[in-house]
Amino acid sequence: MSGNNENVSGITGHDAVSDDQYAYDSEVYDDQNAYQRQPADAYSNEEFLDQADYDSMYGEGYNGYDYPTGVTESYGDEYTPVDTASSGINQYSTEKGKFTRPSDEYESEYSDYNAQPSDANNFYNLRGDGRYNAYDPSSDSLANVYNSVPYGSSPYDFSNSSFVGNSGSGTPLDGDSGSFYADSANLTNREPYPAWTPENELPLTKEEIEDIFIDLTNKLGFQRDSMRNMYDFFMCLLDSRASRMTPDQALLTLHADYIGSDIANYKKWYFASQMDREDAVGLANVGIYGGKVTSIKEKGKFFSRNKKAPKVVKPPRKSRFKRKKKKEQPEEAEDEYIDVNTDDSLESAEYRWRSHMRSMTQFERAQQIALWLLLWGEANNVRFMPEVIAFLFKCAYDYIISPEAQNVTEPVPEGYYLDNIVSPLYQYMHDQQFEIINGKYVRRERPHDQLIGYDDINQLFWHAEGIARLIFEDGTRLIDIPASERFHRLPEVQWNRAFYKTYYESRSWFHLITNFNRIWVIHFGMFWYFTAFNSPTLYTKPFHQRDGPKPTGASQWAAVACTSVVSCIIMAAASLCEYLFVPRRFPGSKPIWKRLCIIVLIAIINLIPIVYIFGFSSKHQQRSGRRIAVGVVAFLMSIATYVYFSLVPLQSTFGKLSVKDSRKYLANKYFTSNFAPLKFDNQALSVIIWVCVFTCKFAESYFFLTLSIRDPIIVLSTMRPYLCSIYWAGSRLCFVQPRIILGIMYFTDLILFFLDTYLWYIIFNTIFSVLRSFVLGISILTPWRNIFSRMPQRIYGKILATNDMEIKYKPKILISQIWNAIVISMYREHLLSIDHVQRLLYHQVPAEEGRRTLRTPTFFVSQDDNIVHTTFFPANSEAERRLSFFAQSLATPIPEPVPVDNMPTFTVLIPHYAEKILLSLREIIREEDQLSRVTLLEYLKQLHPVEWDCFVKDTKILVEENAPYENDSVSEKEGTYKSKVDDLPFYCIGFKSAMPEYTLRTRIWASLRSQTLYRTISGFMNYSRAIKLLYRVENPEIVQMFGGNTDRLERELDRMARRKFKLVVSMQRYAKFTKEEYENAEFLLRAYPDLQIAYLDEDPPEEEGAEPQLFAALIDGHSEIMENERRRPKYRIRLSGNPILGDGKSDNQNMSLPFYRGEYIQLIDANQDNYLEECLKIRSVLAEFEEMETDNVNPYSESARERNKHPVAILGAREYIFSENIGILGDVAAGKEQTFGTLFSRTLAQIGGKLHYGHPDFLNGIFMTTRGGVSKAQKGLHVNEDIYAGMNAMLRGGRIKHCEYFQCGKGRDLGFGSILNFNTKVGTGMGEQMLSREYYYLGTQLQLDRFLSFYFAHPGFHLNNMFIMLSVQLFMVVLINLGAIYHVVTVCYYNGNQKLSYDTSIVPRGCYQLGPVLSWLKRCVISIFIVFWISFIPLTVHELIERGVWRATKRFFKQIGSFSPLFEVFTCQVYSQAITSDLAYGGARYIGTGRGFATARLPFSILYSRFAVPSIYIGARFLMMLLFGTMTVWVAHLIYWWVSIMALCVAPFLFNPHQFDWNDFFVDYREFIRWLSRGNSRSHANSWIGYCRLTRTRITGYKRRVLGQPSDKISMDTPRAKFTNVFFSDVLIPALLAAGAIIPYFFINSQPGNPMFITDPNNPSPYVHDTKTGTNPILRLVIISLIPIAAGFGMSGFFGGMACCLGPAFGLCCKKFPSIFAAIAHTIQIFIFIAIFEVCWFLDGWSLPKTVLAFCAVTAIHRFIFKILTLLCLSREVKQDSANISWWSGKWYGKGYGYHAFTLPAREFVCKAIELNLFATDFFLGHLLLFFMLPVICIPYIDRWHSVLLFWLRPSRQIRPPIFSTKQNRLRKRIVRRYSALYFSILVIFLILIIVPLAAGAEIRQGLTASEAVAKGAVGWNQTNSSIGSGIIQPRDTNYTANYSFWYDRYHFEFNTTY
């Protein structure tokens, strides 16, 4: 520590050891003596307390956890009026501010550590936790409790303060009075900015800086509160920088970061927009359009894409700049800013810029920073647009330095800047999203590609051409008027004529083609190489299998060389798609047609030799050497083309994006491709990883995938089914069936080819991450001795900054203070018992000569792991985990910490909306609802039994101490007080007395173990405690200076902590909190007075009908409480309007951003936690930003240019998911977060692929705020707001690092529904990211290795899930097509180990060689199986290196035993569905994912309605296909599919708590029946009809207004999807899937090999040309498909008409008439479905496989037809459910439909026809799912074992059964009896409908045998049907190919299935 008093004076901060979080005795409730107690006798013994290990130098009052909080006085002089009585002398200085070293005696005393135990016994006075304040919102005593805290007059009353004055006027800061500066005797000590004091040779005093702010405010019209806020913001920055460098250097570097250096965003914009040319000669003189803009009349749609730009008159393009050689430049050019005659090169311009920056005075630098901050601080939503702020800064500064501004005498009105500059821009952005209808705002249904968003507005200012579009009403351009006039003319700019879309975020899959073109080139190209080489039959004509696959050499080379053409096609498609997304008029768009022409030319060049070989060469010529040489050349050219297109980014194809010294693409270079280069070793590692990935991937794919399809290609491409025919088609369809299968197999193999890459990426990422963990030394596999025994030395060397200590102490003394503070903090959190604490603490013990020495805990020297686990802390406890990680983390390389006084200031920012702040007593001791079986407190006690036991013991001690003062009755029971009976209330609910101070303790204990804001704040306030602890330990001399005045010592420590750390909670809804929420927030402010809350305040409108005024306000725990019981804001800054224009979170963060302080921001969610031992590392963490160097190098010097131009923008940190032990779902969610946030981030950060994920990440405040903030905020598009900060940082030149040694706690969703909601939000958010311009910039500009890292870490993960589900779908289509052949033909013998040849493969004769296809099918199953299971590798490996082999093995098998693979399958489908749905329909939004404990049983109907569309429907379709495949092509591999696909259907119910309880099951069944039937008489929120309507709205959309009224859910409007989007997902895909099911159905009914199809025995042909031959499956399929639909339309019309006739009359006497009518119609439709199923079975000859396949086809046809009807026939959905009720009631009048009354019935007619069919489907599917569960619910004690799997609770600690009243029990029993009878009745009917036909069909099929058929019909019996319907009934199943030998021997027919 330096000797200068400025570095040690004016300390602000908290004591790190002591805090209200851990001190029960120092609360706002001191008068109640709630926690003012001495330690219990059990641990107040001499060894523990009196033998404390701290010297008297810490003063009598030193108690690490005992200091007053919650009162104004404790806040220190910075926030309260100066107390003249305490001003006194400067404790730090004796003469002229110099520090006096202690005497030798003093030093000796401390060196020998000869302390008196009585001087320090308070440190171990283990008292209660300050977080357990006596507080209960539900208690009437709150008023008295609150009033116990003294609050004086408002410390923030600035009514008497002047903001206009000369230097020294002194703007009041944070409540200090104007006389603050007058106390010269105590100036340094009380200085709010200690590093910025006159003693430090300041370039500008704070009064001078203040005058700058006042002057700018007066001239530009800023708000006073905003000015004060920004002044404090600036001074905190200066104080932070000046604490580790000279003040002059601090101001200089700040100016460099904000304005002038190469890393400053403003400088980049200045040159990118050619403002240097504008300042020199004007843009009109350098080719930018000049003259006046002609008058424009707006036409067409509002801001339509086709709207033309303003026409301008262009003067002759003559540049006044002339090129000169550098040597001709005058040497004195440095002294001149710019000269029109100088060189126009970028290099010269930058040289002149640096010269000007060096020549600026510090006043000018401070003025520029102040101006930028004032503009930014009041910019509201414009803060998301950094280049707009840069432009405003340019305009404002041009005015400020003009003579006009210098002559201003009258100040501009306050709010001028907001009202005239910011508000018009805000209003434009607001109007883009909202329109006024009937006086209310309604959100526009405007897709992203028609909405001009933040980025479009911002990018207009990237280029001079965009700035030139800013015009006035008369057409004059802003840029053409003098620079000094522009700022005040900005209100006249016609903003709506300037902006246009700069990138079209069209909802299209084409984005993937452009953004990831290299992924497709790499994979498609290599797939073509492999597959073309192994598909000789496709280019060997004629091919004869008996000759084997012997293609000509030239043809094989040429076929493989087609890869280049494929690559060119992909590149051309990517370029054409880019043309769709990037408007040509945007100056930053690169020419596409030139690139496209070159691509076409390359394709033609590559195609010429291929065409020559295949088109102009015979087979004989293809074997010649010349043709082979041509083929080789074509192959070599294809490799060159393939490699080039794979390596080079799309934007850099055929030329770099920008050349040196070029001005045109500077904006693209600076803002979209300024990627930080990797260090050589990291770059090498990146390349090595991807070389390894693709080497293994290509090798494995070739040998495992490609070679396995080689034989299927040979047999299927040459296979000719013979004698097969169906009516109307003959042999046309069945003849090409093998080739159809081959095409689907090719596509499936291609998808698996993509999946393999991700598999190898996971493997190698894990391998390299593990290797790096060993390099860093963070693996637990390091010996125990190395981790724990060396921990004291590592604490001394890596936690403490001891190099600058003026007084040296023995390391043990310093270490003991840190270690004891950590242990005691865990004790206060009830993680350790007092016995554990005694074993872990350093103790003072007697030594020689009466001295005392410190005894090291045996914990550090223990050699036995078992002893450590059992002796020092509970086994597998939170304390063990935290201490283990702390020890491991210290073994890693950690930057050396700087002294506390020199560390930078930082802020923790926590956005909060409606998250739970503090649990109420009702919430923790009452069951959540009637579906829950356990209270929250009971569940927490089960999860944390040791911690609950510690808490109860602590509470009992507290009660015993307070008992004599509370009432005498307690003391009378002293003898029996500790009996088990008396202790029961403590162990039950944690308290015995209902006094607030006791109930609050229980509430806090529960809140600290749940996902609450209180847990987050209490955890991150540990930063304050850590700073105070470190400052005190490293600077023991300050204790001596204060003597025994502990209060002044505490205030000094508080000042230091407050100076270095701020915690801001952005409580958006604070002003509208409920009473309970407000009381909880007030409790937080009283418990943590330094906590700051930013919120939206509101003033009612001055006039009726006007909008209220909104303000961004800031309060803290020291703010005055006003008469309305609200706190007076410290700052209250008016806003342009409601800042929440997006999805909320990012707007909330942006609103509070001006209130952060310091250089760095840590973004935290409201469900996180932090720990004292982690907070002790904060100095090293901040040092990772690499800005701790204090060398005085001028950032504008030439030498500084060579330094790193890419600062660290984001520092990622580890997360510990503290919800991992909650059960299987919590563990799975935690595992994913741990692996993705830790294991992969470790490698990704090193190879440049990591982005920002919010949670614990630290951000470089200046870098991020000058580049758009900490997130993006366009609604829908930026729903995953935080990752855009990472992409923005990467694009703009920032580096993103990862910190291994620091971690925060994080909560995760715990219930099945909430986890899937989170996955849906992430999946839809990823869909939106695919559309974003950030993905376009990254995908088309990153170098290959970093692009691959980015792709596979982010979009690749989600696309991989999509590919997995697509491969499953394709597999099922292949399976049913293959099964259709297998079922009716004879399959040849096949030996997979033998080479396929004609002689060995066609056995028996006439057979079909399908063995290779079946072998390929098995390989596919194995591939998908491996891909699924590979997801467990990272978690297992992570657990292995973090916690050891045993725990990794245990966790793996616990997950497997708890069916987590089924959950993974379901999650994969949800991800896939989310991204595909979003790209088709949109609708991405923030989904609130509940953070409570999922202990309640959800009804079957809710789960079904929630997951039917994402998963259950597709699972049911797959199951039907799989059932058919199992009956026809059975292999053992299909078992895997049965398990996986069943997971898609049953996973929601399998992971539903208590799903299999017998009584609950049937009560739930009743609810399902009611769910199906309700909602037809009156609207019901939870009904089948409501679910059905909601499902189709994603296609139809909602009517935006009904009867002229605004939408009732403005923010939740679902826009109608575009037809082009829906066509692909809802028309084309269902049509293809329908074809995939129809074609095999036709083949299975084509009777292949039937000799009756031979028309001419003398000249038999395998091909049947007669289209009237065979049965008629086409008509059969049409009948069984259309009858239910026709019946639906018929009943819809009949019942609709009957309702109109009977409804009005019957409705008078029977209110349930509509429901009854609907139930009758639905029941009839159910019976129609049953009849159709039985008829289909009959028509298919009682063949169950054919019937199942028929229903696969029918289901696909119905899906396709209903999609078409919905898309073409249904208009928008009415929000209210009145149309449905009107249909069934017949009451269309009086409903207020207006003219819709004529169209709604027609629409509803179509709806009801569709709904009747969908109802029957849901009825059968729901019952089938319930029937599947019957065997499970019959298992004894199944509910108990099921709960063990879900919650991981032992059977002995199971959640109790629910308790019902007698009446409820009777009712439940009656329900169970009735509905179990209904359930089993329907089950019996289902079984009868299946078993009876199955048995009857078996009898019927025993009729005619094959031999009888031969005897009956000789050859020539042609089965020709004369009538259409004669072939509708399919004959019984007969394998005619089995009789091939008979026909061959008897009639000498020979039909081969192969060529």
Curated annotation (Swiss-Prot):
GO terms for molecular function: 1,3-beta-D-glucan synthase activity; branched 1,3-beta-D-glucan synthase activity. Keywords: Cell membrane, Glycosyltransferase, Membrane, Phosphoprotein, Transferase, Transmembrane, Transmembrane helix. It is an enzyme of class 2 (transferase). Residues 1-10 have a biased composition (Polar residues). The modification Phosphothreonine is found at T976. The chain crosses the membrane at residues 519-539, 557-577, 596-616, 628-648, 687-707, 750-770, 1362-1382, 1421-1441, 1507-1527, 1531-1551, 1624-1644, 1677-1697, 1713-1733, 1748-1768, 1815-1835, 1877-1897. Residues 1-45, 86-117, 308-336 are annotated as: Disordered. Its EC number is 2.4.1.34. Disruption phenotype: Cells lyse at the division site and at sites of polarized growth. Residues 95-104 have a biased composition (Basic and acidic residues). InterPro entries: FKS1-like_dom1, FKS1-like_dom2, Glyco_trans_48_dom. Residues 308-327 have a biased composition (Basic residues). It is a multi-pass membrane protein. The modification Phosphoserine is found at S969, S971. It is found in: Cell membrane; Cell septum; Spore wall. The modification Phosphotyrosine is found at Y965. The keyword Transferase applies. It catalyses: [(1->3)-beta-D-glucosyl](n) + UDP-alpha-D-glucose = [(1->3)-beta-D-glucosyl](n+1) + UDP + H(+). Alternate catalytic subunit of the 1,3-beta-glucan synthase (GS) complex. Synthesizes 1,3-beta-glucan, a major structural component of the yeast cell wall. Required for maintaining cell integrity during cytokinesis and polarized growth. Belongs to the glycosyltransferase 48 family. May synthesize a form of 1,3-beta-glucan not stained by Calcofluor White. Component of the 1,3-beta-glucan synthase (GS) complex, composed of at least the alternate catalytic subunits bgs1, bgs2, bgs3, and bgs4, and a regulatory subunit chr4. This is 1,3-beta-glucan synthase component bgs4. It comes from Schizosaccharomyces pombe (strain 972 / ATCC 24843).
